């Protein structure tokens, strides 16, 4: 056998490539500030809801806070996606400040998990599981309702903005002032 043949123990040539370096995300201080301020507001509202007394294993304050956050965040997202009268920067600030900040500070997955786990640990297994399931199911319902509301609000604001533009254009074309 030829000593140069691959079967004679010669190693095949391999090409190694180094993966491209990961680029760190750009941190914008104005976005950090609106998230921080929104989070403070959402957390304060969450604290107010926490003062609502629980009904057995059903923690009303946590439930209301989470449902409101689901509805508002989904509604805000749908509204901003459909509203054409705002620029990209305004939409980003609103999404980060109101959505991530206020709604993020308002909602509380960790407290929900703790309350459900505590009920189960304390022997209220059915009540704890029911609380968790009802919260998740109604959270989806609230988010769906929020998407519907946000979509319709965006559609009606776009229609009114277009009607206003049409009225201004008609007035201008007739020699009036816009």
UniProtKB/Swiss-Prot annotation:
Which family is this protein grouped under? Belongs to the fluoride channel Fluc/FEX (TC 1.A.43) family.
Tell whether Transmembrane is among the UniProt keywords.
Answer: yes
Instruction: Report the InterPro entries cross-referenced here.
Output: FluC
Q: Which residues bind Na(+)?
A: 104, 107
Catalyses:
fluoride(in) = fluoride(out)
GO terms under biological process? cellular detoxification of fluoride
Q: Which Pfam families match?
A: CRCB (PF02537)
Q: Under which name does UniProt file this protein?
A: Fluoride-specific ion channel FluC 2
| Keyword terms, alphabetized | Cell membrane, Ion channel, Ion transport, Membrane, Metal-binding, Sodium, Transmembrane, Transmembrane helix, Transport
* Principal location class: membrane
Q: What's this chain's function?
A: Fluoride-specific ion channel. Important for reducing fluoride concentration in the cell, thus reducing its toxicity.
> Activity regulation per the record?
Na(+) is not transported, but it plays an essential structural role and its presence is essential for fluoride channel function.
| Organism for this UniProt entry | Bifidobacterium longum (strain NCC 2705)
């Amino acid at each position: 056998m030829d000593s140069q043949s691959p079967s004679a123990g010669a190693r095949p040539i391999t090409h190694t490539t180094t993966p491209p370096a990961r680029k760190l995300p750009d941190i914008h201080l104005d976005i950090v500030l609106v998230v921080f301020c929104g989070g403070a507001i959402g957390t304060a509202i969450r604290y107010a809801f926490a003062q609502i007394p629980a009904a057995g294993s059903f923690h009303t304050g946590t439930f209301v806070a989470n449902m409101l956050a689901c509805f508002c965040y989904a509604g805000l997202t749908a509204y901003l996606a459909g509203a054409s009268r705002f620029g990209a920067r305004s939409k980003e600030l609103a999404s980060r400040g109101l959505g991530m900040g206020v709604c993020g500070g308002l909602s509380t997955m960790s407290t929900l998990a703790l309350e459900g786990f505590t009920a189960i640990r304390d022997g209220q297994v059915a009540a704890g599981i029911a609380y968790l399931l009802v919260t998740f199911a109604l959270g989806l319902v609230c988010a769906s309702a929020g998407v519907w509301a946000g979509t319709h609000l965006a559609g009606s604001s776009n229609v009114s903005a277009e009607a206003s533009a049409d009225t201004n254009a008609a007035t201008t074309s007739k020699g009036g002032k816009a």
